[in-house]
């Protein structure tokens, strides 16, 4: 089953999104992705495997955004 988490607010979105999708991790999935808006551009990051793999792909990117969406895919 897929999980989707979105955030719009004053705080930085990345950590809120990642922590939110981790709470849905038990649902089972094979990949994940995150999209945020930075500098008026959509930035997308994707990874195969667990959320920890997406965290590696994200690294230091997507740190300034205050709006985004993250998902897992079955």
List where the protein language model places each region.
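N-terminal glutamine amidotransferase
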Residues: 1-74
């Amino acid at each position: 089953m897929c999980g989707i988490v979105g955030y719009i607010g004053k705080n930085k979105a990345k950590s809120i999104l990642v922590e939110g999708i981790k709470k849905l991790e038990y649902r089972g999935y094979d990949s994940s992705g995150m999209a945020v808006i930075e500098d008026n551009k959509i930035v997308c990051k994707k990874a195969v495997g667990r959320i920890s793999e997406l965290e590696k792909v994200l690294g230091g990117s997507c740190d300034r955004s205050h709006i985004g969406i993250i998902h897992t895919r079955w």
